[in-house]
């Protein structure tokens, strides 16, 4: 058996390392070996991450010992169906190839999806550009409210996650120092509803007129990145040049020691 662990990117404050270690321990108990476990960064349309950022999310040991890949929204997708809103769902093929599909994220209020977390790791997280653009087109036709869990965009995301077979989701609730103060895990739809209710209660500011749900707890200052990091087999995997997952290391970056090229 094999397993993919989908994690959110560096723009989100989720402390993924301790959660990922717990997930890996459960996978080991289920008989999944290390060589059959890999990570995919749910970038959506965000820029690619490099090795130093992989380490900030997962820690040096996990990055050194497991495959870590950026999602690419331009190629290497599997079509799994259309949502009820007629959005074609195309998912990262490296995600679809795994027997077990697990994701880690954070639940915060979100302008378009009501709350982050839940199925948002799939759409937009590991979807194609076409899927994301069709889903995001609803922002021009539908009125949204932050903290509203019943939006067309979330409906699409949940349908997409159900179609592609997301098995398990872990969502963290963070305090103002980006520390975990609660965790919700299980079926992505059920856990997201519970996490969203908890987040709405704890992130809400009551004013004289009406309560307002804040978008997120304050994000702490990002740590200073190291000036350099060891070049290893994982460093080349952050390269954005399109190659199959099994041969993700970019030849020019690996052989010349050059810095991986920035995203287009």
Task: Show which residues each predicted segment covers.
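Conserved phosphate- and dinucleotide-binding cores of soluble alpha/beta proteins
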Residues: 83, 91-96, 101-170
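An acidic, phosphate/nucleotide-engaging active-site surface
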Residues: 48-115
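C-terminal catalytic subdomain
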Residues: 220-264
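Short, well-ordered beta-strand core segments
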Residues: 101-103, 209, 215, 238
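Glycine-rich phosphate/diphosphate-binding loops that line cofactor/substrate pockets in enzymes
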Residues: 1-4, 29-35, 164, 205-209, ...
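Short glycine-rich or small-residue beta-strand-to-loop segments that form or flank ligand, phosphate
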Residues: 2-13, 38-44, 216-217
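Membrane-embedded hairpin module used as a gating/binding unit in multi-pass transport
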Residues: 144-221
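Histidine-anchored nucleotide/phosphate-binding helix
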Residues: 13-32, 224-232, 238
